Curated annotation (Swiss-Prot):
Source taxonomy: Eukaryota, Metazoa, Chordata, Craniata, Vertebrata
The protein's name in its UniProt record: Guanylate cyclase activator 2B
Assigned protein family: Belongs to the guanylin family.
Keyword hit for Transport: no
Record gene name: GUCA2B
InterPro entries associated with the record: Guanylin (IPR000879), Guanylin_sf (IPR036382)
Amino acid sequence: MGSRTLLGHLSVLAVVLLLLLQGTQSVDIKYQGYQVQLESVKKLKALEEQWVSSPRLQAQDPQPAVCHHPALPLDLQPICTSQEAASILQALRTMDNDECELCVNIACTGC
């Protein structure tokens, strides 16, 4: 009887571990030498919708305003150092989330 209980606990533990591993898989987007997570692109869109930077800062700085947001995901920060940051971030924003989550878009990996 003790071995059945142990076997039952191990089975439950295995199922829990599988569910946790499945939840940690992420879809990555590779674009112009940068690799970012789809979740980061979703957060980028949300940050841009909520943040309005000062017009003076926009006039002085060639970087997109969102690059100065303290909550910008770490994997997007290297893009902000590029001279093409605005166009790269724009391209990432326009990638359809559904296409990446379904792995239709060739730039998306990790499905």
